[in-house]
Amino acid sequence: MSPVYVNLLGSVGLLAFWYFSYRWIQRKRLEDPLPPWLRKKKACALTRRSRHRLRRQHGVIDGENSETERSVDLVAALLAEAGEESVTEDTEREDTEEEREDEEEENEARTPEVNPIDAEGLSGLAREACEALKKALRRHRFLWQRRQRARMLQHNGPQQSHHAAVFCRVHGLRGFQVSVWLLLTLLWSTGHGVSVRCTYHGTDVNRTSNTTSMNCHLNCTRNHTQIYNGPCLGTEARLPLNVTFNQSRRKWHSVMLKFGFQYHLEGWFPLRVLNESREINVTEVHGEVACFRNDTNVTVGQLTLNFTGHSYVLRAIAHTSPFESYVRWEETNVTDNATSSENTTTVMSTLTKYAESDYIFLQDMCPRFLKRTVKLTRNKTKHNVTVTGNNMTTLPVWTPECKGWTYWTTLSVMWRNRRSALLRAKSRALGHWALLSICTVAAGSIALLSLFCILLIGLRRDLLEDFRYICRDEGSSSTKNDVHRIV
C-alpha cells in the first residue's frame, strides 16, 4: 500500500480513537464513578440522611424509633463502661459533620449550578451555541420578511404583497438548493466533453541540401466552433496563447510553452521528422494536435502525424506522473510493403528520440490550452476570423547552430531534468512520509494528553468529594471495628 494511504488511514484512525475516547469519558462522567459495593453503601447512607432530614423538618423525630440515635446511645453506654468517652465525642463530631453536609446539600438544591461543560462536556456547550445561533438567525429572518412585506404593502397593495411574500418564502426555502444545482450544472457543462483540435495540412514538400519547406494550412476548432483558420506560420503570434504569466521565476516555463506551440502548430514538427529522415520520399503531410476530456472527465492530449498513408499517434494523460506511464508512439495503417516497412522504422526511430519531451509537453499544455480557448470563443468578433497570408513554412536543416535547434535542445534538457527530479523525489517520498507519520503520532499523543488533563481539571471537585467520602467511610468502619472489639 502507498505511504500516502497508510498515513491517511493512520490519521483517520487517530481521530476516531480520540472521538470515541472523548465520548466514553463523557458517558462515564454521567455515571456514578464509585464501584458497585461502595455505590450501594453510599446510597444507603444518603437514604438514612434524607430520612433523618425529613423527620427533623416535620418534627416527628423520636429517639426510641430512630435507629441511628439508638445505636449511638448503645455505643456511648458501652464505651462509658470501658472508660472511653472520646468515642462519644467523635460520634457527636460525625453527627455535626453530617448535619453540615445536609445543609450544604439543601443550599445546592436551592441554587443549582448549571454548567454545560460539567453537564454534557463540550458537546453541550456547542449545542447551546448552535441553538443560540439558530434563534438569532430565525429572529433576523423574521424581521427581514416583515420589512419586506411592509415595503411591498406600501408600494404594491395587499394582493401583490401576498404574492411577493409567498415568493420570498419559497425562495428562502429552495434558493440554496437551486443555487447549488445551477453551479453543479455549470461546472459539468463547462468541464465535460470539451475538445480543442488543430489540424494542419502540408503540401508541396520540397527538400534541398540545406532546407526543408512546405505549404502549411492550419484549422483550429473548439467544440466544432472555429477559432483559427489560416497559414501555419505566425499562429502563435496571432492567437493569444500566453497560458503562463511571464514572471521571472516562470520565465523558462513560458519560453518552453511558447516554443512548443510554435513547434507543433506552425509545422516545425513534421519538418524536423523529414529533415532527420531525408531518405523518405514524401510529398504531403497531415497532422493534428488535439486536447480533450474523455468520458471520465480526464484531460487527454494527442499528437497525430500522417505520412502518405502511415499514421503515428502519441497520447498523454494530464495530471499523471511521467515515471508511471509508458511513453511511446503507436503506428496505424501498417502495410506489408518492404519499402514502406523500412520507411516506417526510420520515422519511428526519429519520433522515439523526443517522445518523452512531446509527452510531457502535452501533459503541461493541454489543461492550459483548454482553459485559454474558452476566452477565445467568447470574443468571436476578434479571434474567429480567417487569416490569409504566406502559407510557406521553411525550416533549415537542424544543426547545432540553428536557433530552433538550440531552443528545442534546451527544452528537452529541461524536461529531462524535470523527469529526473521527479524520480529522485519519489525515492525520497518514503522518508518524508515517515517523518510526517511521526509528527502525526506525536500530535495525537499530545492531543489525548491535553484532553485527559482538561477532563481531570473539570472533574477535580467530584474526585475530591469522592475521596473525602471514601476516607470518611473508612474512618467510620474502623471505629465500628474498634467498638466490636471492645464489646
Curated annotation (Swiss-Prot):
InterPro entries (alphabetical): Herpes_UL37_HHV-5-rel
Transmembrane domains' residue ranges: 433-459
Stretch list, region Disordered: 83-121
Residues under site feature: Cleavage site: G193, V194
Residue ranges, compositional bias (Acidic residues): 83-107
Keyword field: Glycoprotein, Host endoplasmic reticulum, Host Golgi apparatus, Host membrane, Host mitochondrion, Host-virus interaction, Membrane, Modulation of host cell apoptosis by virus, Signal, Transmembrane, Transmembrane helix
Residues bearing carbohydrate: 206, 210, 219, 223, 242, 246, 275, 281, 294, 297, 306, 333, 337, 343, 379, 384, 391
Superkingdom classification of source: Viruses
Pfam families: Herpes_UL37_2
Annotated phenotype, changing C44A: Complete loss of ability to translocate host RSAD2 into the mitochondria
Range of residues in the leader sequence: 1-22
Annotated GO CC locations: host cell endoplasmic reticulum membrane; host cell Golgi membrane; host cell mitochondrial membrane; host cell peroxisome; membrane
Gene Ontology biological process terms, A to Z: symbiont-mediated perturbation of host apoptosis
Family label: Belongs to the immediate early glycoprotein family.
The protein's name: UL37 immediate early glycoprotein
Organism (species): Human cytomegalovirus (strain AD169) (HHV-5)
Lineage: Viruses, Duplodnaviria, Heunggongvirae, Peploviricota, Herviviricetes
Record gene name: UL37
